Amino acid sequence: MLLHPWYHISCMKKYADALPLYRQEKGFELPGVSINRTTMANWIITCSQNYLKPIYDYFHRELLKRHFLMADETPIQVLKEPVRRPQNKSYIWLMRSGEERLPPIILYHYTETRAGGNAADFLDGIDEGSYVMVDGYSGYNRLKKIRRCCYAHIRRYLMEAIPSGQEKDYSHPAVQGVLYCNKLFEYERSYKAKGLSYAQVYKRLQKDAKPVVEGFMRWLDGQHPEKGSRMDRAVTYIQNRKDTLMTYLEDGRCSLSNNASENSLRPVTLGRKNWLFSDSQDGANASMIVYTMVEMAKAHGLHPYNYLKYLLDSRPGTNTTDAELKDLAPWSEKARIECNKKSE
């Protein structure tokens, strides 16, 4: 297949710059280039299926080898899904590696529904004892590995329960709960600032953070808020995740929040405001693949355009071995050299 030279530019504009195809179509008309949005959409789908899917699948296999993962999800509208109305919500899942000082892996995945089984299926194969940082969505309960709640979400619920003007009223239960969370985040920041090893962090967690978490649990047991109040909502949220609160202390590589996942979803949510929907399932799947390549490039300090061009010049296929795909990963020395050449 001969790739059109505008393909890389079209991908960059849509997935890195959040410029939808209909606006690109109008922009191309100015210099006298005639490329319609249907043609561009077909380029993206065909190239994603033929050349980018093998490296996407390689990233997926590598992600499942990690022991610290993070997950989040956000809605997407796909107009043409079998036996579904165009108005039905579909979902984009973000699955990424945790903050464990290994090359980051960021994957986007489309499904028709938000059913928890979708997350479990995508992460099927992770090792027993792996950690998956998730938010409060109950669908993640389908994961058969260790789950951890996000203390940032817990803190957010407690902050919402504090009446306006009472943020420093330390007699208010919600303020007290926030202080426990603040102390844990303070410790985490200090460990990172000192550059402690994971073994050192684990020891400090037992000494510093464990008493705080235990105190938070005792505080939680003593809360009996008015039914239907914001404090009741916060306490219920935390109680439902009580069994995962202590897992933060089990390994120095664990983190307190799922903020890295939320940050990784931001480019997709920004793009969605502009392109609004995917027309077809093939289009949605292709978008997830290209978003993965763009965000993987950015996470490794490579220009997305150069990385996409490097991948498509390499033309990986179904017969490409993992050893060969490794050279196409953005953390490989070969990929970095080739992408930097394209910047010169």
Regions found by a protein language model. Give the residues of each.
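Catalytic center-proximal scaffold of phosphoryl-transfer enzymes
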Residues: 1-344
